Amino acid sequence: MKHNLLSEMIDRGVNVSAAMLINNPRAHTGYRIGLDNSSFSPGTIRYVAPEIRAVILKKLNLDEGENICCVSGESIAVEAAIAAHRGNVVAVEYKAGDRQTMEENVVRFGLNNVQIVDDMESYSHRWPVPDVAFLVASDKLDLELKTLVHVNPKIRVVIYTLEFSIMSRIPGMLWENGIEPTEIMQLEVSKVGRKDEIEVQPAPWIFSGQAGRE
């Protein structure tokens, strides 16, 4: 058996029947929820703290075969695609720069179950029907919820927000769209900084809801 670097063998012709075993000692051998932000592609996106992302993924409660729609939730979309590796992720990114960064992350993590789109107002019948959705709340939230419930009347939703003005309106929007709020929580993460001082991270509100409950 001959041992050599793949880069030294890739362009060589093979004249006889042969088999090649490729060993990558740096390959990831397992997945741990809540990847460090340094794992993701830099760019226009400001990623949520890994600890908060881990809680969000727990609240999404993904099965490996489920489909998920992520609205402006880039790192959530990446980890959801890894967790639900037999399902599909529709990543809605309204900004061109964010779509570019998302595409870089898809390549970086070798994902083949992510579809990146720039709009969800008219959810295409060609896109996978989502079992669950994660949304970063914005002024488009009510329209997004209406679209998701239309596509799947029994969809589960998890909503993230740092904005008080939007946070106070979310319960009403959920009920108006036939989604029963099941849990509301606020998360806070503090870390020790370089000067041995406690640095408080942004403390988002997380809303969970279920549509179509009898």
Q: Residue ranges of each PLM-predicted region?
A:
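The conserved SAM/SAH-binding core of class I Rossmann-like methyltransferase domains
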Residues: V71, V90-E93, Y160
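C-terminal substrate-binding/active-site "lid" region of AdoMet-derived donor-dependent transferases
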Residues: V149-W205
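Conserved class I S-adenosyl-L-methionine
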Residues: G65-E74
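Core SAM-dependent methyltransferase catalytic element
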Residues: E8-R12, A18-P25, G193-E214
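Conserved SAM-binding loop of SAM-dependent methyltransferases across substrates and taxa
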Residues: E74-G87
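A contiguous loop/helix-start segment that scaffolds small-molecule binding in enzyme catalytic cores
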Residues: M1-G43
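S-adenosyl-L-methionine
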Residues: V92-V132, D139-D142
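Conserved alpha-helix/loop element of class I SAM-dependent methyltransferases that forms part
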Residues: Y47-E64
